Each structure stands twice: as C-alpha cells, then as structure tokens.
Amino acid sequence: MHRRDLLKASAALALAGIYLPRPATGATSVTRDSATRLKTLGQAQPFDYAWLKGRARTMAQQAYKAQSGELPAKVAALDWDQYQAIGYRDDHALWANDKLRFQVKFFHLGLFFKQAVQIHEVRDGMARELAYDPEMFNYGKSGLKGADLPKDLGFAGFRVNFHTDLTRDITAFLGASYFRAVGGDWQYGLSARGLAIDTGMERPEEFPMFRDFWIERPAKDSSKLVVYALLDSPSVAGAYRFEIVPGATTAMDVDVALYPRKTIERLGIGPLTSMYQYGENDRRVANDWRPEIHDSDGLAMWTGSGEWIWRPLTNPANLRFNAYADNNPRGFGLLQRDRDFAHYQDDGVFYDRRPSLWVEPKSGWGKGSVQLVEIPTADETFDNIVAFWNPEEKPQPGQELLFGYRLHWGAKMPVTPNLATVIATRTGIGGVIGQKRTYFSWRFAIDFAGGDLALLGKKVVVKPVISTSHGTVEITSARPLDAIQGYRAMFDLKVPDDVKGPVNLRLYLETDGQPLSETWLYQWSPPADRSFG
C-alpha cells in the first residue's frame, strides 16, 4: 500500500494506543475451523443486521469506554520499512481453498495502526470470531518473530481480493473508520470514512472507529460481498452494512444506523477524504518538477433542484470551510476529471489513474449542506481535502438516525450532466498583453466540453453568466475552442484593495437564456501584494 495511504490513516488514528475490550461471548477457547482452516475464538453466535443495530443502540445508552493498553515493544517500535516487510501468507487467506470469488487477508498491527479490531466470519447466519495467528504472516526482515508475539494480538484491519486478480486489492478497511476501493484501473486514491465528527472546527476532530467487523461468506459464483461493522466513539455508536460489487466501477451499498450519545455539532455523512497539492488552477506550492499533484481535482454536486455544480479544489494558505446548502441532494463526490498522464508525469503513483468517488443517496436526506474542508499542505503525503453531507438538524442523544447511500469508485461516474462540464480551470495575471497595467486584476480561464457545445452553429451567441461576491468583472468572453470541441470562458476580476478574504465566483454558459453548462464555483484569495503595474 502506498506510503501516503498509511500516513492519512495515522491522522485518523489520533486516538491510537488503546485496545478495545473483546465483548464477552462465553467460552474463548481457540480452535481451528475445518472449513476456513483458520483459528477461531469461542462458539459461533447468531448474527444479522438487526442484532447489530440493537447492539449499537445498547452501547449508545452507556458511557463510552476505551481501555488503555500497550502494543508489545517490538511491534510498537516498527518503522516504515520493517512494517512493510511483514507479508501475509496467501494460503492463510479467508476462503483460500473454497473456490469462491473473494478472498480476505488481514493487516498486522504496528506502525500507525495500534488499535486492534475484532473480525468475524458469518456463515449461515452464525458468526465466529477469527483469531490472530502468527502463522498467517511472513515476518521477513521486520525483526519480529511470531513465536514471541501474544496469541491474542489481534488485527489492524483487512483487505479483499477478487478472483479476476487475487494478487491485487479491490477494497481495504484500515484505520479508524477509513476504507478505500479501486475501480477498473486497480489504483487506490482517495478514501471514504464511516463517519466524520467536528471536521474543520476549531476544536480537535473526533475520529470514530470501526471496532468490530463481520464478513459474510458469499455464495459460490457470487460477485457480491457483504461486510458489517460496529462503529464507536465518545459521541456515537453505529451499525453499518456494506454490499460490495467490484468492477470497472466498484459499487458499495452502505446502510447506516447511528445512535448518538450526545449532541453532535457537525455530523458528516458519507465523508470522503482526498489530497490536493496543486493543479492547473492553484499553484501556490507548485515547487515540484511534476506539473500537477492531486488525487482529486474537484467537488461535483447534483442538487435536489437538479443543478449540476463543479467546484475546483484548492490548497489554501489557511484552512477553508464551505457549506453548500441543499434539500434532498441527488449526489456529490470528489472526482479526478483530468486523466491525461502528460499533466502529471508520474509513472510511480499514477495520479491520472486515481479513482473518483461519487456518493448517491438512496432516499431523501432532507435539508442540510454538502460541506467542503480544504486544509493547507506542503506535500502529497497529507490528505487535506474532506467532503461530506451535514444534516441541518443536529443529532441528539436517544435518536436513531438512518442513512442509505451508494458509493461509486472508478474513472467514470454513474450519472453525468446532459450539459457541458468543466474540464480545466486556469488562472493568472489579468490585463491586456502589451499594454501597461495600471491596476491589479486576476484572470480566470474555464474550459467547457460536452453537452451540445460541439453542435452549436457559428452564429449561435454563447454568453458567460458571471457573478462575484467582491469586486468587478471585466474583459469577459466565451469563444469556441476546437482543440476540446468546446468553449473557453474568460474574465478578469478586479477587487478593491481593502478586500482581504476569499472571493466567491460563479459562472455558467448560456444561449438565449438557456443554460449550456454546469455551474462553475470558485473561491479565490487576493494576494497581499498587488503592486502589478
């Protein structure tokens, strides 16, 4: 797994260093299961989603408890190279010998991953906890010896392989409530989380944790895998059901039941976490030889009223928080629209292959807002972008909150506008080339393609409709651009010297009062030095 994927999890494991207690289930003897050939703990117990919701509800009625504990010294001291040296033995994968389409392998504790999770297999409605076994791992040059490790050490998480290529992951659950998946390019990128709490606020963010997992044994020849998870944190307990179908676009149906322990100021449903260092539109820290560095380049939204919105991402000098009010949103996501290798020139991590992730609500979510948090970062090892849905009403203790949504991971999204979409945003100094500038202005060039743009006749007048929260717009245009079979909209923005904070911009293309494109939103901060002459 890529270095940055682990570092992003380290941020989510701010509460690391504790073990969660294993719930009492009667006998805890270790046996080897005759079907999976893996060691199990205790007796099989009845399991279904209704039971899991009941357990989460009961937990929420009790005070949150986290028992302190320490990893074995040698495990806690593992550095990056040592942790990477720990391999999983393929012959110990869950269902390795069962001729099913899925196999599951487990992550070892260590490095950033210091909290053990309990993992169960569900077969015919009965769940049995899988036991940690040093024989599952090849410790290589890690410096660890399996015989020296506690028999109840536990796992950090798990990853799933599919029969089309059992050497590569389709999804992984690792760290707090983080999980990720690939599409047809078999490339990890951005992550999702089970829940976000108080993200982007002045006080520390709370990171709920998936403390238990139940993985349902799939039917023979089934391409669907069902995973259940129990979420816990000081503010909330929750039950999750994931129905995972891999493919060119990997789909995950997610059902969520939340039971707050206390009032939650900022609840994030369907949270997405990504990285944006710099790109065509924002080159504040573009000091690398590569032209662009990002996992995602924009936030896409399909509002309840049917409007399509594209908000390019930025790497601001200071944390930015934006909320886009909506009622029953149809979808939102962090997308990687730019898929041209030449724009990245990275043949190691292949940013041009990073999946987009679209959140599709399965029922009405009511009033609230899609919220975007952009955090300054100096390099690509830190995930600095978060997007999620925030309900208008704050969750209260004693409530049951139910949400259902589908996650789509891949290069192509399940729905796209029938209008033209933004394919690039570029910015630079304004004014007229060759003429002396007498005041500071900033130019914006937005390229649109798709929809009906390529079909427009030469006499059709296309206009950019532009609005700004501060300053004035000048030198506006919208002209055909044959290279993209679309149009380029351009304008200069002049802002008064006393405007210091961000300026909100909005633009779309129209003809005869009819929209031709999605709506482009942008937030730009004027530089402190505007002494261009």
Give, region by region, the residue ranges found by the protein language model.
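N-terminal export signals
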Residues: 5-27
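Extended, loop-rich substrate-binding clefts of extracytoplasmic carbohydrate-active enzymes
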Residues: 189-247, 363-378, 382
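Terminal accessory/anchoring regions of large secretory-pathway or extracellular enzymes
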Residues: 30-80, 87-89, 107, 343-533
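Beta-strand cores of secreted/periplasmic/IMS beta-sandwich domains, seen most often
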Residues: 116-123, 250-260, 404-407
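Solvent-exposed N-terminal domain segments of exported/luminal and surface proteins
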Residues: 62-201
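Acidic, contiguous internal or C-terminal segments within carbohydrate-active enzymes
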Residues: 229-278
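A contiguous, surface-exposed recognition patch within enzymatic or periplasmic domains that forms
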Residues: 81, 184, 265, 269, ...
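A mature extracytoplasmic/lumenal domain signature
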Residues: 123, 134, 229-233, 246, ...
